[in-house]
Amino acid sequence: MTEEQKREIENMLNKYSRRKAFAEEELDEDMRCLYESKINDIFEIIKIMGHEVKCAGMVKLPNKEYKYFLYSII
């Protein structure tokens, strides 16, 4: 992996990550597939970087809105 690729991954992680929970957004139905794809990409990158990934997925809130989440131990 080149230094540029490492910086790109670090920037992506910094953009989406907090210590415990991150990448949490409410999205309309049209955006679900796109966002799930993004979460899966981030999930894989975090594993490649050697961090322990706890959970990734989607929850349906009581008001029927969807919330996406990704938990990681960094």
Residue ranges and their predicted role:
Residues 16-23, 42:
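Non-transmembrane amphipathic alpha-helical segments
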